[in-house]
Amino acid sequence: MKVDYYEILGVTRECDDKKLKSAFRKLAMQYHPDRNAGDKEAERRFKEIGEAYEVLKDPQKRAAYDRFGHAAFENNNQGGGNPFGGFAAGGFSDIFEDFFGEIMGGGHRKRSDGRERGADLSYNMEVTLEEAFSGKTAQINIPSSIVCDSCEGSGAKKGSKPQICGTCHGAGRVRAAQGFFSIERTCHACNGRGEVITDPCPKCQGTRRVEKNRSLSVNIPAGIEDGTRIRLSGEGDAGIRGGPNGDLYIFLSVKPHEFFQREGADLHCRIPLSMVTAALGGEFEVSDLDGIKARVKIPEGTQNGRQFRLKGKGMPMLRRQQVRGDLYIHITIETPQKLTQEQRELLQKFEKLSNHENSPQSHGFFSRMKEFFENISGQN
């Protein structure tokens, strides 16, 4: 007993053409003979999927199937006959040829004239934060494949030329019969090129290309970030038989800086201050990455972790280089170490002279803590 066509494709009877085609594509790829060589069950499912789609993709056949089921397509020689006359081998061939031609093409398949696009190349480059700030022009050397100058890219020895492939007759594809439909595959004799080289070029060994180091000038724009990718069109490996060159991708990483940390277009810098400067106030100079200095005033009583913002002193934005981020100064207060006896005595004297107004947070905290423990003792 035949399985329901909708069940075969895993769709409902109400599904539209788009869902029907999507289900067919998924199953056809899953059970394609190229992916399941020698698997008879996969071959059976593949044929079954094609048969179901052949009916359901056609509005008239689908309407007849919805009304009469499989009986609509049986040649039982009874009155009136079968208006559809069963399935023709050509129908399946057309379905799979269109489907797999669309899927396997997609810009990756070799052209019918044998032209192939060259491979893309990648290059990793490390730059300093200063170079990321101002931009630079860098010279790089990359190993790549270029067209062989001895055979001019034909792959054949001088005085000879490639021969048309006797298996595919220059098409680059061959058809293999699978029951009542045929499958188109890449020709194994010429790897889809449509030609074979019987007398290869001694320089490139028939590959049509040779390896060579090339020197390139790369423009690094100001404002690039760690992980930025630059694409140089046509600077990858050479194409074959007049095919386009691949592209070169430059992947940039920015070295950690001694003083500045970066967050987007903003820069952050930690400045240590002595306890005395933080208490009495003062000022200091700081330079941004273009060397311009700015004076930062420290008010009396500056606390650890305080932040100062210098507008427009950060990094330029990659796509709006006239706009810059900000520079944030983070204050860290340095507690004195290895005190002399005199320094220790002075600090102890300072502590005795201090009151809660000098250190409101610590005074208030310890007062509350003392009160807390006194209450606990009183309860016990």
From Swiss-Prot:
Its cofactor is Zn(2+). This is Chaperone protein DnaJ. The keyword Zinc applies. A zinc finger (CR-type) spans 135-213. The J domain is necessary and sufficient to stimulate DnaK ATPase activity. Zinc center 1 plays an important role in the autonomous, DnaK-independent chaperone activity of DnaJ. Zinc center 2 is essential for interaction with DnaK and for DnaJ activity. It comes from the Bacteria. Zn(2+) 2 binds at C165, C168, C187, C190. InterPro entries: DnaJ, DnaJ_C, DnaJ_domain, DnaJ_domain_CS, HSP40/DnaJ_pept-bd, HSP_DnaJ_Cys-rich_dom, HSP_DnaJ_Cys-rich_dom_sf, J_dom_sf. The keyword Chaperone applies. It comes from Bartonella quintana (strain Toulouse) (Rochalimaea quintana).
